[in-house]
């Protein structure tokens, strides 16, 4: 079964790590022109219209029982081969290869942190939501807090939120909205997608990974925070301490993508060992 997930608007025009293959950086995350602009805009228009406090809470209720599927982490990785991600017109290969490429990039740069290697393998597994029938605007893309006014660095902020009912609700339409100053991102309701879902899967199944790993998974698509430097009014000191880890992971999130595919069969035993160490057995999804 193949499910079209793309285009993932958060993954368009991102650079490679290798400077020899990197393009002009001005062309990356370009939301003013380009062949994919219309469909990327449409994706964000749907996202920014429908991602409300009530919608996100309904998705937590819908998926919070973790009763959709029982499978191991490696089975979830293999399921990514059934996802057709149309966000990258230049490189066409299964998402599972990207998982291993990201993990191997981290492994090379941080050989002493095996838990970090596993984060690379895990980070996009929440995209199995697409196999459960979720629309792509509720699976992929940059994330943002609901329940408060969107900040300036949110993609298409000025042109896609007009029909979002929360912005007509005085509880949710101010800079702080329903939150207290510096309440901490752990008390913030994030827009629903593969980041938040995978974070919840990890918590429910009691992954024995360090807090940094949970932050990387939950916030790797929160570009308005880790790159746009917005939403500081919600951050606690713990969030600021974790921010360098999220940014470090961001270097490898798709930046390691290249047509030289890894030999997955040779890599599987190493990563299966990490799975057995940190998140073994059949998990609830």
Curated annotation (Swiss-Prot):
Tissue distribution of the protein: Kidney specific.
Binding-site positions, substrate: 29, 85-87, 127, 141-142, 220-221
Amino-acid positions noted as binding Fe cation 2 in the UniProt annotation, renumbered to this chain: 124, 194, 220
Binding site for Fe cation 1: 98, 123-124, 253
Intracellular or extracellular location(s): Cytoplasm
Cofactor binding, note field: Binds 2 iron ions per subunit.
Cofactors named for this entry: Fe cation
One Gene Ontology term from the biological process aspect of the record: inositol catabolic process
Gene Ontology terms, MF aspect: aldo-keto reductase (NADPH) activity; ferric iron binding; inositol oxygenase activity; oxidoreductase activity, acting on NAD(P)H
InterPro entries: Inositol_oxygenase (IPR007828)
CC terms in the record's Gene Ontology section: cytoplasm; cytosol; inclusion body
Xref: SUPFAM superfamilies: HD-domain/PDEase-like
EC number, UniProt record: 1.13.99.1
Protein family (similarity comment): Belongs to the myo-inositol oxygenase family.
UniProt cross-references to PANTHER family, sorted A to Z: INOSITOL OXYGENASE, MYOINOSITOL OXYGENASE
Protein name per its UniProtKB record: Inositol oxygenase
Gene symbol of the encoding locus: MIOX
């Amino acid at each position: 079964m193949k499910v079209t997930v793309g285009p993932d608007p958060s993954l368009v025009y991102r650079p490679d790590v290798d400077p020899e293959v990197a393009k002009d950086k001005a062309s990356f995350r370009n939301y003013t022109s380009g062949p994919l602009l219309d469909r990327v805009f449409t994706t964000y228009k749907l996202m920014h219209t429908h991602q409300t406090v009530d919608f996100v809470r309904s998705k937590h209720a819908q998926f919070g029982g973790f009763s959709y599927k029982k499978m191991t982490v490696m089975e979830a990785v293999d399921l990514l081969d059934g996802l057709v991600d149309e966000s990258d017109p230049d490189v066409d290969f299964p998402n599972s290869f990207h998982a291993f490429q990201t993990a191997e990039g981290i492994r090379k740069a941080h050989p002493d942190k095996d838990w970090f290697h596993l984060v690379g393998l895990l980070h996009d597994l929440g995209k199995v939501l697409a196999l459960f029938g979720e629309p792509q605007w509720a699976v992929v893309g940059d994330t943002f807090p609901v329940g408060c006014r969107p900040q300036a660095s949110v993609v298409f902020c000025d042109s896609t939120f007009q029909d979002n009912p929360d912005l007509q609700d005085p509880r949710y339409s101010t800079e702080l909205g329903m939150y207290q100053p510096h309440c901490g991102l752990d008390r913030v309701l994030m827009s629903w997608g593969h980041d938040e879902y995978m974070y919840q899967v990890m918590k429910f199944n009691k992954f024995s990974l360090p807090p940094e790993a949970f932050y990387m998974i939950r916030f790797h698509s929160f570009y308005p925070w880790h790159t746009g430097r917005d939403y500081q009014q919600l951050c606690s000191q713990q969030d600021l301490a974790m921010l360098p880890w999220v940014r470090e992971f961001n270097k490898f999130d798709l930046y390691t993508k290249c047509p030289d595919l890894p030999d997955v069969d040779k890599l599987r035993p190493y990563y299966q060992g990490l799975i057995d160490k940190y998140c073994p057995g059949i998990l609830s999804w």
